[in-house]
Amino acid sequence: MKTAMDMMKLEEKIRAKTCEYGLKLYAESLQRVADETPRVGSDGKCLTQGRMQDALVRTPYGTVHVRAFCGRCAASGRFEVPFKETYCRGSRFAMTPLMERRVAVTTCETGSFEKCERLCAEWGCPVSDDKAMDLVRDLGGSCLDSDLPPLCKDAAGTEDVLIVSLDGWEGRFRGERWGEKEECRDGHVDWHDIKSAVMYRLSQVADISAGRRTIVTKHIVCVPPNTTPEAFAKKVEREAERMGMLRAAKVYFIMDGATYLWNIFDVHFSSCANGTLDYYHAVQHLAALADALFAGEKDPGPRREWLDRQCHELKSIGPKTLLETIRAIDWKGIRRREARKTAKREAAYFLSHEDHMDYGGNAALGVPIGSGAMESQCSQNQNRFKRRGQFWSDEGFAAFIEVYARYTNGELKYCFSRRMAA
């Protein structure tokens, strides 16, 4: 009786024959492309001291040998192979664009470059982890915003509601003293804030079970470490416009209380969007205010009752009751100095967000009152970029995060457009 193992062996034979035939077609096609590639260098001028050489190119079916022209570039002084420079990034370990894309996608979906190496070997195209890393670095460096279309494929239309949320997460980087002896640990590791954003159409939120929802399609923004708030704001503004911000029926920004985030909103988006303070973040500040107002009370009942009432009314009808309560506070009645200081700080916080707490109105329209989508995206980002043993260089992280964002947004193909058009 035949077993599943026998079937697997049969499948392997069929796959081997298919790859053999596909590799033959690849070799013929790539040779024609190499023969037709203009013999000009990176400076656009004809190459000198020309000769033919063997070029090894990795494809999804295996390695192909191609005879390609090689010549000396007058501007750079180095020998160039136009075929590889145009289509295969010019490296000694050349890959076709489709092979590059598969390796890049595998790198984004797996937890490490080592896992990418193992998975590539499993589907028949061995690539070492360092070569995958080099590819991602090179690919990320070639990504330019000018290559992207004016509008994303999932951009909001004139009847859509666009949701935008901003936040940040901590990334782990190699410090100035990375690699020094074990006893000198200070300065080995640096932690940097990675500013990020997620945007989506409200119509793309789907219920998957009672109390659980998911976002079908979304668009993310991630910037390298040490990016200034202003540079981050311009990046978010550009991507929000590509997501249809200027033509959407309504736009909502939902964020926690970080000062720099609301400065970004006030300067760049307040004229075209509604701002919402994350409800659960507001509740944390309400709890701090309750602690200050009821400081010294032995019975926790009044504090709990006051906090429950304020949270309920804030969520259902908005900030009116809370703001009236704050404005009626008898500051002299709070005898403890630290409690009075805390109460004033929290009161000022809520007064500054008076226009950002219409939770009842949001709920009536189906608009989220919390930034859970952003928290989820931060978790997903960290699941790839902050795993055990991962310590990034600034340059490597910047390149990879760009590739990762392009892949998540379904726009990885635009990383190839400039080189292919050369």
Predicted features by range, described:
Residues M1-A27, C70-A422:
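Catalytic center-proximal scaffold of phosphoryl-transfer enzymes
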Residues T37-F69:
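N-terminal juxtadomain amphipathic helix
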Residues R32, T48, V64, A155-G157, ...:
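Sterically constrained small-residue positions within well-ordered secondary structures
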Residues S29-V40, C46-Q49, D160, F173-R174:
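Extended, Lys/Arg-enriched charged tracts that mediate electrostatic binding to polyanionic substrates
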